[in-house]
Amino acid sequence: MNFGNIVCFNRVFDKNEIRNLISWFLSNYGSIRTKELLDKMKNFGFTYATTTGLSLGLGDLKIPSSKANLVKSSEKILFKTRNRYKNGMINFINVLDEERDIWNVVNENLKKESINNLRQSDFLNPLYSMTLSGARGSITQVKQLIGMRGLMSDSQGNVIPFPIKTNFKEGLNITEYFVSCYGARKGLIDTALKTANAGYLTRRMIYTAQNLIVKRSDCFTKYNTCVLLQNQDKEELKFLKEKLIGRVLAKTIVNAKTGDILVSAGQDICNYTFKKIINFPEVYIRTPFNCVLMEGICQICYGWNLACGKMVELGECVGILAAQSIGEPGTQLTMRTFHTGGVFSAKAKEVITSPLNGKIWYDLNTGLRRVYNKFKEKAFLTLQEKKIVIYENDVSKSIMFLPSSTLLYVKPGRKIFDKQIIGESVNSNLKNDVFGIEEIRDVKAKISGQIFFPQINSKQFGKIFWIISSIIMSFTSLFFHLTKKFSFKNKLICPTTNVHKKELFVNRKKELFPRKFGKLFINIRNVNSLVDKSKVLKKRSSHIITCILDQDKVIMLRNLKKQKRIFGNFKIGCFLKTGQIISNFKLLHSSQIIQERKEFSIFRKVMPFSTNDDTLMRIEDKPFIRKNQLLYRVNFVREKTYDIVQGLPKVEKLLEARMTSSLKEIINNPHDILTESFFTFLDDYENLVAARKSFEVIQKYLIDGVQTVYKSQGVKIADKHIELIVKQITSKVIVTNPGDSSFMVGDFLDLNLVEVLNKRLVNSIVYEPIIMGLTRFSLSSQSFIAQASFQETTRVLTKAALQGRADWLSGLKENLVLGNIIPAGTGFKN
């Protein structure tokens, strides 16, 4: 809204909105008026902070009403998952994955619900005001107060498979409290020990980049970097805008239809310019990688000073600025892990939840395909946009349109509750890159018996094999009512429902060897209920037989009506799953029908196992196997908490260009990628072009790797800061043939220097590109004073004295050590 000269923003101003306002004001009105605005905002803030106050009480912690339903439905889903595991449909890795995914989704939904609940019901809630304004605390902490703590990680970062379902307002039980202590310990350890690592990484980067000072306005390089703009989605365009604003164009952009020049080469890209070039397929820009100055960097290749949105000034220490920009978030985030207290955080999959209680309806006949998800759960895959209607009391209350490639888990006509998960995006169901440790887990037999591989393996469920338990003994006898306490002589334990489970019966007229039998029965605990004497009548019409094998391994059922086929279509030798109801009996274990007679049938206990392609089998078909003997080994990734404490070693590994980790060679390490790229390009290009192109490949790899770590923690670092550090460690080549030069084989030279020298030599220098890690680069500095102040002081100074080296005092460090004016800022002009 615009009322004359008054600009009105009708929205809540949190931290980000204030940042956007100041940025907009600065670019439109300049720095002097922005300074006045900031003064007014400061006075306004302090005035109201003085006259108002916030107090936080237990009544302000409002738990979302949907929490109980969410937790209950998640437990039901996991119960079904464990049953599928018992029936051999999935393996234990699928169980672990689904448990982690389910609790992550519940946690994420509760976090959103907590905020929405406060936003809708109590807008002036102190907790909401403090957190959402960005003044104090984070949503993660609010979630723990009024949502649930969720999965925790121990001091090594491993996920503890026991979720804390309560929050701090409800209070934790004993078990949850002790699990919670693991996380608190992790926070303390990280704060105490890992902060030093973050600080040391900053120091090494500063030593590497301290010579990068803006020395000239232009280096007149012929190199440039191409950025593709076409076929990008909204997220990509937002990312590209951040990448391009503040850069300088290397090539003029012309309107193809009119021939008019839209943007000239050498012009910096601002918001206005970006709107002009957004419809072009590609643009060419200058980056620090393109700069060909021997020392420092030029203004055009660097671009804007992002602090003020103007071209960087001559004499600016952009190298140290870059090192601090990368190092500081690492230090801050390491200390911040203390406050979150070891809560396991991973990206939750994108799920679709019901907006209300009611019944779901959609057309089953069009645009759907029956599929299984990665946990072998039945689902419908939408092949096109699907209309979903939710009814409450037979009245249509909500209509949703699901995009194609969505998995639906609820059938039409089923009752659903508010916030129930009814589907998920297929992209989230694909296997994500998981941060964790690859492990090989041994799977052992839980019972003794014979291995059996069915002829046909299901496409949906992979390979399934069974362990068939072996019969040890069989006996029968009749028991009557229980009349004496804890006596098993002539007693009957009978069922209380039509579905019989966990009962103990024997047949009549057979000798039992009372002592051995009694001893065996003491160990059996599968007793459901004992019947009161007054309520039980003597019953001889039903005879049910239990054959004991290694404590209840084989079950024999006798039917009083003496039907010929008591189990319908089940044949001898077929396998039955846990929970199946057979002639009013619910099977407690997976079983195989091994004998069927006129009066009874015999079942043998079996145990199914599911395997996949990563399984290393240790058994063959039909051998006998003992309890606890190795069945197979399976590879899986044990997920760990991914916070900055795990991220910083990754940044360090990339910037130090490590080849080994824990005495093992790193597969696809930067050195291997660079060498492979160089020799591939060398087939088509000359030495210089091949070296530059292979450096481009590794530079992109390193920048993406570092950005991934910081983006996962929600930290934005401008690409140009990382580019400056990466430029330093990818600027050297190793001489393989000195040609007409005075250099030796194995000497390290700057690529820009070699390019200049080769233009003057008849027999050119032949070389290969190399990566120097931060430490190695600092120790190969031209200044021996800077080298000595970093590490190995005695060795560096002794070697410099023996070689008679001269130090030209061109960098910051050497001038600082000797007390001279540093060649930056006002010292640069002098």
Swiss-Prot record:
It is an enzyme of class 2 (transferase). Pfam families: RNA_pol_Rpb1_4, RNA_pol_Rpb1_5. GO terms for molecular function: DNA binding; DNA-directed RNA polymerase activity; metal ion binding. CDD domains: RNAP_beta'_C. Signal peptide: none annotated. GO terms for cellular component: chloroplast; DNA-directed RNA polymerase complex; mitochondrion. It comes from the Eukaryota. This is DNA-directed RNA polymerase subunit beta''.
